[in-house]
A protein has these predicted regions:
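Charged catalytic cores and adjacent phosphate/nucleic-acid-binding surfaces used
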Residues: 1-12, 23-24, 92-95, 115, ...
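Short, conserved active-site loops that position catalytic residues or coordinate cofactors/metal ions
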Residues: 6, 38-48
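Divalent metal-coordination and catalytic microenvironments
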Residues: 8, 30, 42, 75, ...
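Short, solvent-exposed loop/turn segments at secondary-structure boundaries
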Residues: 15-20, 49-54, 219-221
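Glycine-rich anion/phosphate-binding loops
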Residues: 17-24, 88
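Alpha-helical scaffold segments that flank or form the walls of functional sites
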Residues: 24-39, 62-72
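Short, ordered loop/turn segments at secondary-structure junctions
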Residues: 43-44, 80, 188, 213
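Extended substrate/RNA-proximal surfaces in nucleic-acid metabolism proteins
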Residues: 50-178, 230, 238, 250-254
Length: 254
């Protein structure tokens, strides 16, 4: 059982020293660990502190080409987009698709939202609310925002679902399956109940195991997800980057 690729890794393009290593360092570790492919998926453009800047994309593209040539690892350019409105907007524009090989989407606390209402009900309500016992209204708002995002954008992976942003897991997972989106088993945190894992598996939801590495040495470290696969007997046919390379939505020219 081999991990073919790690599709959630951060570099120094996640600003303010949030990501610790370069593209080349991430790729070198991936090569040493036998990975065939990785994605560089720094924080989205609207993150208040850690987001990559669009003006940095040409240099990132150059870094990726250089690292590919040196290491032989295939490297995808992506972003971990942020949900920024109750209406399911995320911080990517249509013109961004021209450089994106992969699009991840998740919730993060400190983002520039579309309006003050979105800041209050999306960010503040979740940042300061009880993460374990959300009100029905908050749960419904969060779930609806995710469902709308999945319907609007060519998202490939939902990252760390429910972390700081509780949702109706099964509703989101069913929509993800319908849209060909993978649910991440995150290398740092997995916020699912045993029942939710069993239902998602029975429903045929596709999973992807990623490290969420913020340091080069963490690239390819997916024991958290692998242990869950073993524990709940998730069929490997439902894990898209074990013993195979996953397919992602076509974005260029959309």
């Amino acid at each position: 059982m081999l991990l073919y690729g790690d599709y959630h890794t951060h570099t120094t393009y996640s600003r303010h020293n949030h990501g610790k290593g370069s593209v080349l360092e991430n790729a070198s570790v991936a090569a040493d660990k036998g990975l065939k492919q990785i994605a560089i998926t720094d924080h989205g453009f609207n993150h208040e502190f850690f987001g990559i800047r669009r003006r940095q994309i040409p240099q990132l593209q150059e870094d990726i080409l250089n690292a590919k040539e040196i290491t032989g690892v295939d490297i995808l350019l992506g972003v971990e987009a942020n949900i920024i409105s109750l209406d399911g907007e995320v911080d990517v524009k249509e013109e961004d698709y021209e450089f994106l090989d992969i699009l991840l989407m998740g919730y993060h606390k400190c983002v520039h939202t579309s309006s003050m209402k979105d800041k209050a009900l999306l960010c503040w309500a979740n940042n300061f609310g009880n993460p374990f016992r959300p009100s029905k209204e908050r749960l419904n708002r969060n779930t609806t925002a995710f469902l709308k995002a999945l319907d609007k954008y060519p998202i490939d992976v939902i990252t760390h679902l429910n972390y700081g942003f509780p949702t109706d897991t099964i509703a989101v997972a069913k929509m993800a399956k319908q849209k060909g989106v993978y649910v991440e088993l995150n290398g740092k945190r997995i916020c699912f109940t045993e029942e939710e894992i069993e239902i998602m598996t029975a429903e045929g939801v596709k999973f992807i195991v990623n490290s969420d590495a913020h340091r080069p040495e963490r690239v390819g470290e997916v024991n958290n997800g692998m242990n869950l696969i073993y524990k709940y007997n998730i069929p490997l046919s439902q894990v898209v980057n074990i013993d195979k390379l996953p397919k992602f939505h076509k974005k260029r020219g959309n």
